[in-house]
Structure formats: C-alpha cells, structure tokens
Amino acid sequence: MYLVTAAEMGQLDRLASSEYMIPSIVLMENAGLRVVESIERHFQGQVANRRILIFCGKGNNGGDGLVVARHLLNRGAEVKVFLLARPEDIRGDARTNLEIYQKMGGKLLLLLGESHLQRADIALLYADLVVDAIFGTGFKGAAMGLPAAVINMINKAHRETVAVDLPSGLEADTGRCFGPCIQATWTVTFALPKLGLVVEPGASLTGRLEVADIGIPQKLVATQHFNRRLLTAAWCRSQLPRREASGHKGLYGRVLAVGGSPGLTGAITLAATAALKAGAGLVTAAVPRGVQGILAMKTTEIMTMSLPETPAGALSRDALDPLLERLAEVDVLAIGPGLSRDPATVDLVKELLPRVQVPAVVDADALNALATDTRVLTGDHGPLVLTPHPGEMARLLGTTAAKIQEDRLEIAAKYAREWQAVLLLKGARTVIAWPDGQVYINPTGNPGMATAGSGDVLTGIIAGLAGQGLKPGVAAALGAYLHGAAGDEAARQRGQRAMMAGDLLDFLPYVLRNLEEEVETIVAAGLGRD
C-alpha cells in the first residue's frame, strides 16, 4: 500500500479533477460519506439519537466534517457542529456544505474565542462521539491559540474521537506533533495513507487506521511514482517463497550463521533456529571452538562448525579461510549475533565481508565492527542487508540515537543508497530502505518485543527467507513483517510484559501458516485489513 505526502495527495486530487473531470465537491462528498459509514460500523448501525459533536475548521477538512454532519443528521443523530471560524470566512466546497447543513436545520455553534469554549466543554460531557475536522493535510508546525485550546479540551474530555483524514495538530509528512494534537480513537484517511499516520509519534496518535476509497481512479494512482509503501498481509503473502512438491532441503536454502562467544551462545542459537523456522532447508552455526559443544547441546536440527578462537574465546582472524571455504557451499550468510567485540573478531568481520558474494545479513556486533571502519560499506561488496537498531546506526554514523530517531526514514533511505545495501532500521514502525530508493514501513510488532534476542530472531528470519531465493530487500521487508506478526500473536496469547525472544520462534510457524492459507488473523497493530 503506497504512502503519500500531503503534496502528493494534493496532486492526486488535482489530477482527478483536471484529467478525470471529477469535481472536487464530489471527492469531498465521498470523503464525508466514508467517515459516516465508519461511524455507523462503530455504533453497529445504530447512530439514531447518538450525541455527536463535530469540530470543523475553515478549510477543506472542515468541509469534510460538514458533509459528515449532514449525513448523520439525516440518519437521526443529534449533531452539533462547532465551527472555529466565521461563516463568511468559509470558502468553496466547504461553504456549499455549510449552507446545505444550515438549510437542513443543523445546529451550528461558533467557537471564535476562549469565551465560547465553555458550551463546547459542557457538550463534551454528554457526547457519544467527537468528530475531529479542524486541520487537514496542509497543517504544519504547532497548533496555537484557539485551535490549541479546543484540541486540549477534546483530549481532556476522554471521549471516543474519530479524526477526519488525520488527527488535527499532526504533520501529515513527518508524523511529528509540535503542539497539542488530537488523540484519536480511530482515523479515517482518504485514498491513500499519509506518511505521518504510520510513523511515530503520529501512529500512536492516529489510533486504528482506516483507509477509505473516495473515488480517485486507480488508473491515476498507477501513473504516479510513489517510493514509500506500508507493508500489508496481501503484499507479504504474494512474496512468500513457493514450496514445490518435488522440493528438497537443498532447494530451500543453505544458511551459514556466524556468531557466538562465551556467554552469548543464546544469540546465535536464536538466529539459526529462526532461519530454519522461516523455511531454510539447512542451517549451520559457525562458532568459536570453545562454545561449539554448548551450541550442539542447545540444538537438534542445526549443524555446527568449529572455528579458531582468541584466548578470550571469540572468533579469531584465523577463522577467515575456513569461513570462505564454507561460504562457497551456502546461499546466504547471517553474521553478528553474539559475535563479541574482540579486536581480532572486529578485524575478521572487516576482512570477510568484502569477500562475501552471497547475500549477507549483518547484525549486532558485526555492525559494531563495521562502525570502526565504514569503508567496507562504501567499497565493493556483495548483497548486504544491514539490520541496526538506532544505537547501532548511530555508531555507524558517529552520531546519537536521538538524532537517528528524529529522521528515521530519510536517514535509512540516504544510507541505503550511499552504501548500496538494504538497510533495515529497527524500532517502532521498522523502516526497510532499498538501494534503489524504495522504502517500506512495517506496521506489525509491539513493545513486548523489546527484549534480549528479539533482533537475533529477525536476523535469522531474513536469512532463512533470502536462502529460499528471495531478493535481499524482499527478504528484509517480509522478514520484518513476519517477525512483528509473531510478536503480535505472542502478545495476544501470552501478553507483552513477559514476552521472550523464544516466544517469537513459537509463534512464527503459526503466522506463516495463516499468511500462506490467507487466514485473516494477521491484522497489523492499529490497522484494518488490507
């Protein structure tokens, strides 16, 4: 599902009118009707006699709200419109809908100053629902003055609130909120989701997101060159590797997982197990000689490979040649889980990666090794999938995690191009950037997954998918979705607070089966179905 900026959405609206002769007032009517239908579903078809307050600004978003008011009035709801502007200041299609609403006898109350707030505050005490139609996609900066006071008043009332297109006070392009912003119960956005609705903090303010068709021709959408997508179950289902009836384990990918060190054998075990559970045919865990026995006792299905080690028990520079020999026999490399930051291991990583020709999924201490010399990334290398969390990304760039979080999408996209690697930036709403400029945002996952070993599971899933022949970017995007969906299922069945990385392994097969069989149990947090 494409994600758009305010400018891109505005261009679609204009082209729908200029090239397809769809009047803008028709788009406004369709938008308002979709919100009304959503409200009807919310109340299970019973909107008659519901006390619904609609707060309208003076722009087109307010016009959408006036369409909502008209149709709810026709359906028997007790509607009050609070207008944050003088009627004579309303223009265009919004003015037309205001006049229709007034001719229908609808209640219109003006909010022109703080002295008018008391009546709205009292009405909120008895409201069944609030409709937020104050600001639209053109809003930038911070809500101030009267609009800010109204937004704060609505939030303090703690009434169920549906936002029209996006919560007022939220920037459509960035998801940032520099002043008060509506905390919506759910949001009905039009045609395509706006970027700011699916990245934090916007995603948390949006509530459940519904994407409504307002009649913009799909033929028109197909002519546009949008490079950002929201991952959906439908897209992920279409990317699943096929399992042939005549298939064998060699056909489904040979994965070499390199990592482990004293005290950190769990990380490489999780990654290797995840690769198998993601569908890989054969997985070998290559670890320091001193921990091979521990790993062999931990696992049954995973093969192990013993490698030379340093006096501290980490992988030594002498592991390079054995690894290169084994890499000639596998389809994908996963490197980093539990690897350690031993100086000899750091040197090993920097010498190994430029010589790897198969796709390599690079995580954890392998990323920390690259942070000591990023020339490995800017030089010649094979296909790479880098999977940093914000702290690891900050080390790669010599900055802070806070700076990374301020501009996650742009940073991921920039360095995916610069390093010619797939860059998966972990966090709430994980970003997957491809070297060609495409960016995917993953809606699955929850805070319970912020636990030791979760990233190791993700590394293994991606490697397992890449081993089955998926391109690195597809493997990373699909892997992120499956990883988060497994976490969501674990949260539903076991709760978030006590979640462990092993729970993700338990529920990954369940998620894969349901996705493959098109069972609609995978619903991304905050989103409706595809």
Swiss-Prot record:
Domain YjeF N-terminal: from-to ranges: 9-222
Disulfide bonds, paired cysteine numbers: none
Catalytic activity: (6S)-NADHX + ADP = AMP + phosphate + NADH + H(+); (6S)-NADPHX + ADP = AMP + phosphate + NADPH + H(+); (6R)-NADHX = (6S)-NADHX; (6R)-NADPHX = (6S)-NADPHX
Name recorded for this polypeptide: Bifunctional NAD(P)H-hydrate repair enzyme Nnr
Region (ADP-dependent (S)-NAD(P)H-hydrate dehydratase): 232-530
Source organism: Moorella thermoacetica (strain ATCC 39073 / JCM 9320)
Stated role: Bifunctional enzyme that catalyzes the epimerization of the S- and R-forms of NAD(P)HX and the dehydration of the S-form of NAD(P)HX at the expense of ADP, which is converted to AMP. This allows the repair of both epimers of NAD(P)HX, a damaged form of NAD(P)H that is a result of enzymatic or heat-dependent hydration.
Lineage summary: Bacteria, Bacillati, Bacillota, Clostridia, Moorellales
Gene that this sequence comes from: nnr
UniProt keyword terms in alphabetical order: ATP-binding, Isomerase, Lyase, Metal-binding, Multifunctional enzyme, NAD, NADP, Nucleotide-binding, Potassium
Region (NADPHX 1): 60-64, 136-142
EC number(s) stated in the UniProt entry for this protein: 4.2.1.136, 5.1.99.6
Residues noted as binding K(+) in the record, renumbered to the chain: N61, D132, S168
The YjeF C-terminal domain, residue ranges: 232-515
Residues that bind ADP: 426-430, 446-455
